[in-house]
C-alpha cells in the first residue's frame, strides 16, 4: 500500500456565488459558520494526488466516485490523504483530521451495468463552451498540477461542475448541496 498527502487552502470561485450557499451570507443563513466551498472544488483537490500517482492515463480512461460527508468552509486547510490499495485509489479530504469528502478513483471504468434513461420531462439542449470559465478551473481553485495548462486539458472537476450547472439552471431554486457524483472519463479533452 502506498500512502501520500497533499494540502491546499480551500476557496470558492466567483462563479460559485450563483448558489447562495457558497457566500458567507448564504452559508450563515443555512446555519453554517460561513461560505461552503463548492463540492466540485473539493473534488478538484481530491484529483490532485490521483493524477500524481496515476498520471494522464487516469484522465483518459479512469473514473471516480466522490462523496461529500460534511462541508469544507472557505479558507480551511484541506489535506488530501491518499491510500493506494491495488485496484483503486482512495483519497480523503480532511480538515483538522476530520474526513469531509472521500473519493475512490479507478484506473478504468467499472462495469456500470445497463444505463437506461428514466422516463420524464426532458431538459432543453444547451451548448456549453469550455473556454473562459472552464478552461483553467483547477488552477483557479488551487490545484497546482501543471499538466492542465501545459497540455491545454480540461480539469476533471469540470464534468461534475457542468452537471451542477444543469441542476442549477433547470432543477433547483435557491441554495442546494452537492452530495455525491460518479465521474467516467472517456478521453482527454483539450481546449
Roles of regions detected by a PLM:
Residues 8, 15-18, 44, 50, ...:
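Generic hydrophobic/packing signal
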Amino acid at each position: 500500500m502506498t500512502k501520500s498527502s497533499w494540502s491546499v487552502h480551500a476557496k470558492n470561485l466567483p462563479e460559485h456565488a450563483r448558489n447562495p450557499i457558497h457566500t458567507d451570507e448564504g452559508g450563515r443563513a443555512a446555519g453554517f459558520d460561513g461560505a461552503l466551498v463548492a463540492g466540485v472544488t473539493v473534488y478538484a483537490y481530491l484529483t490532485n494526488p490521483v493524477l500524481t500517482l496515476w498520471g494522464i492515463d487516469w484522465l483518459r480512461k479512469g473514473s471516480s466516485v466522490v462523496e461529500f460527508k460534511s462541508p469544507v468552509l472557505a479558507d480551511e486547510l484541506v489535506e488530501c490523504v491518499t491510500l493506494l490499495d491495488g485496484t483503486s485509489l482512495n483519497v480523503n479530504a480532511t480538515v483538522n483530521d476530520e474526513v469531509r469528502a472521500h473519493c475512490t478513483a479507478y484506473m478504468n471504468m467499472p462495469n456500470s451495468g445497463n444505463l437506461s434513461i428514466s422516463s420524464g420531462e426532458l431538459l432543453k439542449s444547451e451548448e456549453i463552451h469550455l473556454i473562459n470559465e472552464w478552461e483553467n478551473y483547477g488552477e483557479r481553485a488551487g490545484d497546482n498540477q501543471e499538466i492542465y495548462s501545459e497540455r491545454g486539458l480540461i480539469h476533471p472537476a469540470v464534468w461534475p461542475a457542468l452537471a451542477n450547472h444543469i441542476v442549477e439552471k433547470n432543477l433547483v431554486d435557491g441554495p442546494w448541496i452537492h452530495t455525491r457524483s460518479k465521474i467516467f472519463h472517456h478521453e482527454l479533452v483539450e481546449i
